[in-house]
């Protein structure tokens, strides 16, 4: 469970700053477009003078946007399809929770724990530092903490 102060800090300060800084970087190179998912999927296509700013701030925006999208005031049960995929990938839902918790608590400093679909189409748990996003590794994030 999250407290209001932490959520307000992340929404009104952190996320808002990532959006403002990503927009400022993108304004320097309108020719590259504004699709952060596409840009972060191949960071070598981002001009060098704004690359790190977009990795940090574009990643921060995408990471937080997914996090907000996944939040719900009500407990949600997972669908049968998702439960089956988790069982196949991790052995059980309890094993998934243990591995996901380990990814989250094992991250030193700031970062994220992720449930992703990897390049092979399989579920995988991973962790990224700071505002790095698994999109840059060719993975599709589906759960973030």
Curated annotation (Swiss-Prot):
<dbReference type="GO" id="GO:0046872">
    <property type="term" value="F:metal ion binding"/>
</dbReference>
<dbReference type="Pfam" id="PF02777">
    <property type="entry name" value="Sod_Fe_C"/>
</dbReference>
<dbReference type="InterPro" id="IPR019831">
    <property type="entry name" value="Mn/Fe_SOD_N"/>
</dbReference>
<protein>
    <recommendedName>
        <fullName>Superoxide dismutase [Mn/Fe]</fullName>
        <ecNumber>1.15.1.1</ecNumber>
    </recommendedName>
</protein>
<dbReference type="GO" id="GO:0005737">
    <property type="term" value="C:cytoplasm"/>
</dbReference>
<keyword id="KW-0464">Manganese</keyword>
<feature type="binding site">
    <location>
        <position position="64"/>
    </location>
    <ligand>
        <name>Fe(3+)</name>
    </ligand>
</feature>
<comment type="function">
    <text>Destroys superoxide anion radicals which are normally produced within the cells and which are toxic to biological systems. Catalyzes the dismutation of superoxide anion radicals into O2 and H2O2 by successive reduction and oxidation of the transition metal ion at the active site.</text>
</comment>
<keyword id="KW-0560">Oxidoreductase</keyword>
<dbReference type="InterPro" id="IPR019832">
    <property type="entry name" value="Mn/Fe_SOD_C"/>
</dbReference>
<dbReference type="InterPro" id="IPR036314">
    <property type="entry name" value="SOD_C_sf"/>
</dbReference>
<dbReference type="Pfam" id="PF00081">
    <property type="entry name" value="Sod_Fe_N"/>
</dbReference>
<keyword id="KW-0408">Iron</keyword>
<feature type="binding site">
    <location>
        <position position="10"/>
    </location>
    <ligand>
        <name>Mn(2+)</name>
    </ligand>
</feature>
<dbReference type="GO" id="GO:0004784">
    <property type="term" value="F:superoxide dismutase activity"/>
</dbReference>
<keyword id="KW-0479">Metal-binding</keyword>
<feature type="binding site">
    <location>
        <position position="10"/>
    </location>
    <ligand>
        <name>Fe(3+)</name>
    </ligand>
</feature>
<dbReference type="InterPro" id="IPR001189">
    <property type="entry name" value="Mn/Fe_SOD"/>
</dbReference>
<comment type="similarity">
    <text>Belongs to the iron/manganese superoxide dismutase family.</text>
</comment>
<feature type="binding site">
    <location>
        <position position="64"/>
    </location>
    <ligand>
        <name>Mn(2+)</name>
    </ligand>
</feature>
<dbReference type="InterPro" id="IPR036324">
    <property type="entry name" value="Mn/Fe_SOD_N_sf"/>
</dbReference>
